[in-house]
């Protein structure tokens, strides 16, 4: 492709609203442009990268036995109502009405549509297992789109769905697609980890996320320093044991703590260590209000609270709800004198506290010498806190460290969550009606492009891995007015294309500095500069990833490039 014919508008300055490297560079290099908040156009170079990621995805999905189809982006509300998610999915689901006031949603995901499709067509175990996938635009009304392609309102996604007669069949396909996902991200050149995850609004259990390691990731990965254990911090269980001290229990005492609300403030004011304080929070679990206790140096994990109750929605209670429940402000919450009809659950660590402190449910006061069970009753002790760095790894091997990650893929064992809700059944080999057993497997295709850009860049621009680079080789005649340089550039361009390489020829009448700056910004794997030594048959070859350059005789160029790109 000749650069003079390409639409690739570059920017010299970093856009003001672009916070992270991938967002900045994809805009500066002319790979994309913003249409509205969280909505982007892919320009020609960006589209080539996107298509290459799609191709890798398709190859690995088909190798794993999945078959491609395409479902509608607009979905009837009745299907979402049938599954129950019309009411529970939340405000991210884009909803609309047609001229006849019939309700629809723009597809945030396609479980309902695929389940409806398969239940009408697959009636026997003989047609199972079945794995179908699509690559299609998804829509989510993100409250705060940010980070370019990493959190948008419109994005390209590969979603696959598998249907089974037995759990063993689901397990087999799940493992196969888990491997396919590992292959996809490895082929894209990414440094990633597969981690144990929470299923969230998707439902089901046994789920893994594929996380690209990056400091700008919105998720925290907890991993062992000596084993392969890795989990989203939300899902990492705490296996610590807590020993209760033999300190004698003291008499409960209420003390004034004016303007002291946060644990750090109360701890310093009372000269009591944070790990002897009891942090009290009220959560709304579906429609039920529950008091949750953790140690002062720990944080409540709301996913664990959700799992205790098998709830659909868990969120912090509002100030108004707390006031109505306990007649106090949030900063004064405590478990003492809470009426018996209000359930209190606590993390295991709370049980070991002796002579601790807690809020008094009265503004400006706290209790000291608080002892669980003597001073208040707990309905259930369980694991409710986030794991911390330095904790024992849940697999018993090593200690926990943290890393940040960008989620690019997620695989779920949905079970019968959707098939039972939507009456999607089949006849088993005994002629009995059974619900279809399902799996679900998603990859953020456009997000993967951003994740690659986030991992592969330097101070000068993008540094694309060969497998996804828009072109393999960038040929740059320095002076297009020179017949020797221009003709040699054309000859190299044509011969490399004949050898199967994708080549970009910078045939613009620009200064050398502009051409080289754009070349670094685009980040193609190999740059061939045709300069003053063209008359001698010599060109300069530079490897973008390492910065290494060498003068090469043009007759040896193809072999030299083949060795670089092998």
Curated annotation (Swiss-Prot):
Q: What is its EC class?
A: ligase
Cellular component (GO) terms are: cytosol
Q: Which UniProt keywords apply?
A: Aminoacyl-tRNA synthetase, ATP-binding, Cytoplasm, Ligase, Nucleotide-binding, Protein biosynthesis
Major localization class: cytoplasm
Q: Entry's SUPFAM superfamilies?
A: Class II aaRS ABD-related, Class II aaRS and biotin synthetases, YbaK/ProRS associated domain
Q: Which reaction does it catalyse?
A: tRNA(Pro) + L-proline + ATP = L-prolyl-tRNA(Pro) + AMP + diphosphate
- Determine the domain of life of the protein's source: Bacteria
Q: Does the keyword Cytoplasm apply?
A: yes
Q: Which GO terms describe its biological process?
A: prolyl-tRNA aminoacylation
**Subcellular localization, per the record?**
Cytoplasm
EC numbers on record: 6.1.1.15
NCBIfam families in alphabetical order: PRK09194.1, proS_fam_II
Q: What is known of its domains?
A: Consists of three domains: the N-terminal catalytic domain, the editing domain and the C-terminal anticodon-binding domain.
The record's subunit annotation is: Homodimer.
Question: What protein name does the entry list?
Answer: Proline--tRNA ligase
To which species is this protein native?
A: Bacillus cereus (strain B4264)
Q: Which gene encodes it?
A: proS
């Amino acid at each position: 492709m000749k650069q003079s014919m390409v639409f690739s508008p570059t920017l010299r300055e970093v856009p003001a609203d672009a916070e992270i490297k991938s967002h900045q560079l994809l805009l500066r290099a002319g790979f994309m442009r913003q249409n509205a908040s969280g909505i982007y156009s892919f320009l020609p170079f960006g589209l080539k990268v996107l298509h290459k990621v799609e191709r890798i995805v398709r190859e690995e999905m088909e190798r794993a036995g999945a078959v491609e189809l395409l479902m509608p982006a607009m979905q009837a509300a009745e299907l979402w109502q049938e599954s129950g998610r019309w009411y529970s999915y939340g405000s991210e689901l884009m909803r609309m009405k047609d001229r006849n006031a019939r309700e629809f949603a723009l597809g945030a995901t396609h479980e309902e549509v695929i389940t409806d499709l398969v239940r009408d067509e697959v009636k026997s175990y003989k047609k199972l297992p079945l794995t179908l996938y699509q690559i299609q635009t998804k829509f989510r009304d993100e409250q705060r789109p940010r980070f370019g392609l990493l959190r948008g309102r419109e994005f390209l996604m590969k979603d696959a769905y598998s249907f089974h007669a037995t759990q063993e069949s689901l397990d087999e396909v799940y493992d196969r697609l888990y491997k396919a996902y590992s292959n996809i991200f490895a082929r894209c050149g990414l440094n990633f980890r597969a981690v144990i995850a929470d299923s969230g609004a998707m439902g089901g259990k046994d789920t893994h996320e594929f996380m690209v390691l990056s400091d700008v990731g919105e998720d925290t990965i907890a991993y062992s320093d000596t084993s392969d254990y890795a989990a989203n911090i939300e899902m990492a269980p705490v296996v610590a044991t807590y020993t209760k001290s033999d300190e004698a229990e003291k008499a409960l005492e209420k003390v004034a703590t004016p303007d002291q609300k946060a644990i750090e403030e109360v701890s310093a004011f009372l000269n009591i260590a944070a790990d002897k304080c009891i942090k009290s929070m009220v959560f709304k679990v579906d429609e039920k209000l529950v008091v949750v206790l953790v140690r002062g140096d720990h944080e409540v994990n709301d996913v664990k609270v959700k799992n205790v109750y098998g709830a659909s929605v868990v969120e912090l209670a509002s100030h108004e709800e707390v006031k109505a429940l306990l007649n106090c402000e949030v900063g004064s919450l405590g478990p003492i004198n809470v009426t018996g009809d209000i359930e209190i659950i606590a993390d295991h660590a709370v049980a070991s506290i002796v002579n601790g402190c807690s809020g008094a449910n009265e503004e400006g006061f706290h209790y000291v010498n608080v002892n669980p069970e003597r001073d208040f009753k707990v309905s259930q002790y369980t694991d409710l806190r986030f794991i911390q760095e330095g904790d024992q790894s849940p697999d018993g091997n090593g200690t926990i460290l943290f890393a940040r990650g960008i989620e690019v893929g997620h695989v779920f064992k949905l079970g019968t969550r959707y098939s039972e809700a939507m009456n999607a059944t089949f006849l088993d080999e005994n002629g009995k009606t059974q619900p279809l057993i399902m799996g679900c497997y998603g990859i953020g295709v456009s997000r993967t492009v951003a994740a690659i850009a986030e991992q592969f860049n330097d101070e000068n621009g993008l540094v694309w891995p060969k497998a996804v680079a828009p072109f393999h080789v960038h040929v740059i005649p320095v002076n297009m007015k020179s017949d020797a340089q221009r003709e040699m550039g054309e000859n190299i361009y044509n011969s490399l294309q004949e050898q199967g390489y994708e080549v970009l020829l910078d045939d613009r009448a620009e200064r050398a500095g502009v051409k080289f700056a754009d070349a670094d910004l685009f980040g193609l794997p190999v740059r061939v500069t045709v300069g003053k030594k063209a008359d001698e048959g010599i060109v300069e070859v530079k490897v973008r990833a390492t910065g290494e350059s060498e003068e090469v005789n043009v007759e040896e160029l193809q072999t030299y490039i083949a060795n670089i790109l092998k």
